[in-house]
Amino acid sequence: MVIQKNWQELIKPNKLQVTAGDDPKRVATVVAEPLERGFGTTLGNSLRRVLLSSLQGAAVTSVQIDGVLHEFSSIPGVREDVTDIVLNIKTIAIRSQTDQPKRMTLRKTGPGLVTAGDIGAVGDIQILNPDLVICTLDDGAEIRMEFTVATGKGYVPAERNRPEDAPIGLIPVDALYSPVTKVSYRVETTREGQDLDKDKLTITLETNGAVSPEDALAYAARIIQDQLQVFVNFEEPRKEEAAPLAPQLPFNPALLKKVDELELSVRSANCLKNDNIVYIGDLIQKSEGEMLRTPNFGRKSLNEIKEVLAGMGLHLGMDVPGWPPENIEDLAKRFEEHY
């Protein structure tokens, strides 16, 4: 159907190229190419917004500190004010295996640092940055805290984390639920065959360790896919099963691919076209000497073609029995549809 060409004939990335950062569990760079012109920005901006705002995570939503009535207090023997302690608590990275609120406790006597790793273990909760410093205790000082951990998405300000029946001394905390801490993207021009105006999308993202960068990107894409589904007001007709390639072909069906689909330089592609070399099967039967006798075809173009063919397990000067087949155009079309 003609209408299906709206989406079926658009260029799509073959696969994602993922490069891990210094901390593979937290940092990665993902490249998607080629994309139709303009799609790099469309997809990059959408994914970035969803990654930062819409993924589920866990965070501390409130804290109670023994002997403290409000966040503008100070604690004897503790070097940091309660305001600074709350700011540190806000950055505790948490992985939760439950969507139910949980409580964690911390109790420590000085002197020394109080870190997130000092928080008592809870079965469904994992602290991902145990070295995070919460406060510093002087000799003989003691501190006891109780934290509430909840799950959610995005950013929720402290005032929304105060329950109506909050006890005296409960201090609400800004909840940074998103497991994604940083996202950036850039769009560059790339090449697809002879087209030089395609997009290359590069996304660099960092998480707090609750989810891997690759999984975070996959979840964001799934969210976008699910949100867009409501706009599709039709069902696609079932794709007819493609006719199988003739089993009696005496040669590799990849030879039916046209040479203009190879990523060759403009000079090399034009030389092949001028020499009436249409299919890879035509090309590989040529010897190096024959190719070099082609007008405007030099050693640089020869080396380029040899390298491309080598990547396909082919080379110049091959003998191809049964080439060319009588119905080559029909077979080439069937090959294109099949693969």
Swiss-Prot record:
GO molecular function ontology, one term from the record: protein dimerization activity
InterPro entries: DNA-dir_RNA_pol_insert, DNA-dir_RNA_pol_RpoA/D/Rpb3, DNA-dir_RpoA, RBP11-like, RNAP_asu_C, RNApol_insert_sf
Catalytic activity: RNA(n) + a ribonucleoside 5'-triphosphate = RNA(n+1) + diphosphate
EC number: 2.7.7.6
Enzyme class: transferase
GO annotation terms (biological process): DNA-templated transcription
GO cellular component: cytoplasm; DNA-directed RNA polymerase complex
Keyword Nucleotidyltransferase: yes
CDD domains: RNAP_alpha_NTD
Region (Alpha C-terminal domain (alpha-CTD)): 251-339
Pfam families: RNA_pol_A_bac, RNA_pol_A_CTD, RNA_pol_L
Region described as Alpha N-terminal domain (alpha-NTD): 1-235
UniProt keyword annotations, A-Z: DNA-directed RNA polymerase, Nucleotidyltransferase, Transcription, Transferase
Role, per record: DNA-dependent RNA polymerase catalyzes the transcription of DNA into RNA using the four ribonucleoside triphosphates as substrates.
Entries under HAMAP family matching the protein: RNApol_bact_RpoA
Free-text note regarding domains: The N-terminal domain is essential for RNAP assembly and basal transcription, whereas the C-terminal domain is involved in interaction with transcriptional regulators and with upstream promoter elements.
Subunit composition and interactions: Homodimer. The RNAP catalytic core consists of 2 alpha, 1 beta, 1 beta' and 1 omega subunit. When a sigma factor is associated with the core the holoenzyme is formed, which can initiate transcription.
NCBIfam families from the UniProt entry: PRK05182.1-2 (NF003513), PRK05182.2-5 (NF003519), rpoA (TIGR02027)
Family membership: Belongs to the RNA polymerase alpha chain family.
Protein name: DNA-directed RNA polymerase subunit alpha
Lineage per the UniProt record: Bacteria, Pseudomonadati, Pseudomonadota, Alphaproteobacteria, Hyphomicrobiales
